[in-house]
Regions:
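Metal-dependent phosphoesterase/phosphodiesterase active-site architecture
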Residues: 43-50, 54, 63, 102-117
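Glycoside hydrolase catalytic-domain groove-lining segments
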Residues: 1-34, 50-54
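Generic detector of leucine side chains in alpha-helical contexts
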Residues: 5-6, 16, 29, 37-39, ...
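Long, C-terminal catalytic modules of enzymes
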Residues: 42, 48-84
Length: 117
């Protein structure tokens, strides 16, 4: 999927993936507004993150990726209605531990993977 998106967007030019995220049903949020896959659990989110990053790293044209966003949106929705589990933390600033742990693990390997080690 990443390879197809990158090829369509950039040809041979470098590309920065500006926003991506995955939502999960077990967050307790409605998740009725907002883009991206709606998965079952936070573990599924963590595994999807790892697959996505590894796919991005496999393409030398991808020079960076950016997770959307720090905190979940409110259950009632923000001004445009988005009410989804996009965050690394919930609205009480409590981290989704399994996701944060996986991100820490994966992000710690990015440079080595990109350098072929």
């Amino acid at each position: 999927m990443i390879r197809d998106l990158v090829a369509a967007a950039s040809g041979a030019m470098p590309i920065l993936i500006g926003e991506f995220s995955f939502r999960a049903k077990d967050s307790g949020l409605p998740n009725t507004q907002g883009a991206g896959l709606l998965l079952q659990t936070q573990t599924d989110r963590a595994n999807a993150y790892e697959r996505y990053v590894n796919a991005a790293l496999a393409d030398p044209r991808v020079v960076g990726i950016h997770w959307y966003c720090w905190a979940d949106e409110p259950r009632e929705g923000r001004a445009d209605g988005e009410n989804s589990n996009f965050g690394l933390v919930n609205i009480h600033d409590e981290p989704y531990e399994v996701l944060v742990k996986k991100m820490t693990e994966v992000n710690g390997k990015i440079q080595a993977i990109r350098n072929g080690r």
